[in-house]
Amino acid sequence: MLLEVLQAAEAGGFILIQDSVQCCGRGILRCCINAALKRDEDVHVLGFESPETEVCAGLDSSFAQKLHFHKGFPDPLGWRGKSSFTVQQFTSQHITQLIRDSQPAKASVLVVDSLSLVLRHHDPVIVCQSLQELRKGGVVKTIIGLLHSDLHLQGIVGIVCHLASTVISVAPTNNERHAVATTTRRTKSGKVMQEEEYFSVSEDATLSVQSKPRQHDRVEKEQDSAEVDPASNLTFNLRLSEEERRAKEKVALPFVFSQEKKSALLRPTPGSGRIMYEPDANDDFDEEDPDDDLDV
């Protein structure tokens, strides 16, 4: 699924790459840029955290005219006046005008590196509104953002993830050459798909993906390889022999009311008392006697 997301970015989509201090997601961000350039799309990068040399390292130089890097590093707040685009300018109006000034032939791909710096200096609601306006404005085809989830409250992370159409969460593994990516994709029909995959990023921003084996498949293989009888090591026997089964069936249970006991209780005995009753004309007689079914 990870390769499908990179190779076929849908119009109006918002791809969110979620990482932490344990595993960086900028490698997948570079792969997204590389895939968009190979699709002959204009890419605008708002670089607040990393220099252009680091973000664009390994990209094909033949696509240099399609890549527009708007420098926000190392002065993202514009205190020294050395940035071409600052965090304060992160609004749908400023970004739309920035893209239109480059006169693209078609809708462009917007890359934000990273949304964490923007969220630290803007109201999260305003940031989400700006992202939603950019998705529907027609100038931006796809938004790709990097978010450091361990720098924000879970509520803020949840709001941004809810806005995204695809969320890629990266985490480390025991193997230093690979990391694991959990891709959650929500289609326009509302269907949600999720898949975990191992991935690695080469120096030329090429993504290699390997499917992660499912947990229940491994459990089934272990059960098939070594099936253990749970009653093999018990100190008592759970099974009855044929003789024991016949003896069990002959035992009269105390709570069973047999026909012999019933007849003995209903048979009158000498010297027993009787109740003689003659109904009176004023007696209330109910034809539907609720006790009529009692055998007394």
From Swiss-Prot:
Location of the region described as Disordered in the Swiss-Prot/TrEMBL record: 203-232, 264-296
Keywords: Cytoplasm, Nucleus, tRNA processing
Basic and acidic residues: bias regions: 214-224
Any coiled-coil regions, as ranges: none
InterPro entries: Elp5, P-loop_NTPase
Pfam short name (any one): Elong_Iki1
Location in the cell: Nucleus; Cytoplasm
Record field: compositional bias (Polar residues): 203-212
Record GO cellular component, one term: elongator holoenzyme complex
CDD domains to which the protein is assigned, alphabetical: Elp5 (cd19496)
Pathway stated in the Swiss-Prot or TrEMBL entry: tRNA modification; 5-methoxycarbonylmethyl-2-thiouridine-tRNA biosynthesis
Biased composition (Acidic residues): 280-296
Predominant localisation class: nucleus
A single GO BP: tRNA modification
Protein family according to the UniProt entry: Belongs to the ELP5 family.
Biological role stated in the UniProt entry: Component of the elongator complex which is required for multiple tRNA modifications, including mcm5U (5-methoxycarbonylmethyl uridine), mcm5s2U (5-methoxycarbonylmethyl-2-thiouridine), and ncm5U (5-carbamoylmethyl uridine). The elongator complex catalyzes the formation of carboxymethyluridine in the wobble base at position 34 in tRNAs.
Subunit structure as annotated in this protein's UniProt entry: Component of the elongator complex.
Protein name: Elongator complex protein 5
UniProt source species: Danio rerio (Zebrafish)
Gene: elp5
